[in-house]
């Protein structure tokens, strides 16, 4: 599933081709995504694009009369192509631009979404999200105070979008390893130093992944069709049974909330 770095990589890739350009029309070949494609998108015509933003794992395309909200789901990707590029089986949505380019949405599993809102601040899918991990609001003091009394395993807790957005499965495993924190520890067991270290490494891991263009494990491609390269930096994720790159102990795996967690028993306490 594309996580925050992959969505931010997509945002940076598509923005130059959308902002200060006009959407001539949308071509929707399949409206049956996770939710039906909003009618306002189906009827787009000569809509200037003012900005492309990201909130959590949602892309927000600002138009003069409203906002398109895009979620990539489990297998979605966005590419910028010449206007008359022949669509393939899983190419469901095109935004045809006045520049002769098309923004094409591909989603084999169709768990993504193309929604419309007049105001992102009141949109139901955005209203209850926690702070952005790369912003100042996500601080050591915030994480420490929020974790008080929490018995949930720290891995599962930091993946809760009400706590902090965008720390998905890959980056939760990698951040906890970098912080030396065992994923089974109760969130409430963190002391102030633990919280400071964890906040710092979450920011570092996410920023490094963005700089590397995200992580390509299966479906994710950047807007130019190239893979993300952060997979080469992974220390624990997907390495079950392989030696820890720090101490040599075999990497182990466990389940947290139906998701696989990877960790080093020796390095993480």
UniProtKB/Swiss-Prot annotation:
Gene3D superfamilies: 1.10.8.50, MutM-like, N-terminal. Binds 1 zinc ion per subunit. InterPro entries: DNA_glyclase/AP_lyase_DNA-bd (IPR015886), DNA_glyclase_Znf_dom_DNA_BS (IPR015887), Formamido-pyr_DNA_Glyclase (IPR020629), FPG_cat (IPR012319), MutM-like_N-ter (IPR035937), Ribosomal_uS13-like_H2TH (IPR010979), Znf_DNA_glyclase/AP_lyase (IPR000214), Znf_FPG/IleRS (IPR010663). The keyword Chaperone does not apply. Monomer. This is Formamidopyrimidine-DNA glycosylase. The gene is mutM. Keywords: DNA damage, DNA repair, DNA-binding, Glycosidase, Hydrolase, Lyase, Metal-binding, Multifunctional enzyme, Zinc, Zinc-finger. Its EC number is 3.2.2.23, 4.2.99.18. It comes from Pectobacterium carotovorum subsp. carotovorum (strain PC1). Belongs to the FPG family. DNA binds at residues 90, 109, 150. It catalyses: Hydrolysis of DNA containing ring-opened 7-methylguanine residues, releasing 2,6-diamino-4-hydroxy-5-(N-methyl)formamidopyrimidine; 2'-deoxyribonucleotide-(2'-deoxyribose 5'-phosphate)-2'-deoxyribonucleotide-DNA = a 3'-end 2'-deoxyribonucleotide-(2,3-dehydro-2,3-deoxyribose 5'-phosphate)-DNA + a 5'-end 5'-phospho-2'-deoxyribonucleoside-DNA + H(+). NCBIfam families: fpg, PRK01103.1. PROSITE patterns: FPG_CAT, ZF_FPG_1, ZF_FPG_2. The active site is at residues 2-3, 57, 259. It comes from the Bacteria. GO terms for molecular function: 8-oxo-7,8-dihydroguanine DNA N-glycosylase activity; class I DNA-(apurinic or apyrimidinic site) endonuclease activity; damaged DNA binding; zinc ion binding. A zinc finger (FPG-type) spans 235-269. Pfam families: Fapy_DNA_glyco, H2TH, zf-FPG_IleRS. Involved in base excision repair of DNA damaged by oxidation or by mutagenic agents. Acts as a DNA glycosylase that recognizes and removes damaged bases. Has a preference for oxidized purines, such as 7,8-dihydro-8-oxoguanine (8-oxoG). Has AP (apurinic/apyrimidinic) lyase activity and introduces nicks in the DNA strand. Cleaves the DNA backbone by beta-delta elimination to generate a single-strand break at the site of the removed base with both 3'- and 5'-phosphates. Its cofactor is Zn(2+). GO terms for biological process: base-excision repair.
């Amino acid at each position: 599933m594309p996580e925050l770095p992959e969505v931010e990589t997509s945002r940076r890739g598509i923005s130059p081709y959308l902002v200060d350009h006009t959407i001539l029309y949308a071509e929707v070949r399949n409206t049956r995504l996770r939710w039906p494609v909003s009618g306002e998108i189906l009827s787009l015509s000569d809509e200037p694009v003012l900005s492309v933003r990201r909130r959590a794992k949602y892309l927000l395309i600002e138009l003069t009369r409203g906002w398109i909200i895009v979620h990539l789901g489990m297998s979605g990707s966005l590419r910028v192509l010449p206007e008359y590029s022949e669509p393939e089986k899983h190419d469901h949505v095109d935004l045809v631009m006045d520049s002769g380019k098309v923004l094409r949405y591909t989603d084999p599993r169709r768990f993504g979404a193309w929604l419309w809102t007049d105001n992102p601040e009141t949109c139901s899918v955005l209203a209850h999200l926690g702070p952005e991990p790369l912003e100042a609001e996500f601080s050591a003091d915030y994480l420490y105070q929020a974790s008080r009394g929490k018995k949930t395993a720290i891995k599962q807790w930091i993946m809760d979008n009400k706590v902090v957005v965008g720390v998905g499965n890959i980056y939760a495993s990698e951040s906890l390893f970098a912080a030396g924190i065992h994923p089974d520890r109760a969130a409430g067991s963190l002391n102030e130093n633990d919280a400071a270290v964890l906040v710092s490494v979450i920011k570092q891991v996410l920023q490094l992944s963005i700089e590397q263009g995200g992580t390509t494990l299966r479906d994710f491609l950047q807007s130019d069709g190239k893979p993300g390269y952060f997979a080469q930096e992974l220390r624990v994720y997907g390495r079950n049974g392989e030696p820890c790159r720090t101490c040599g102990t075999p990497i182990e795996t466990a389940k947290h909330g139906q998701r696989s967690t990877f960790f080093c028993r020796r390095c993480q306490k």
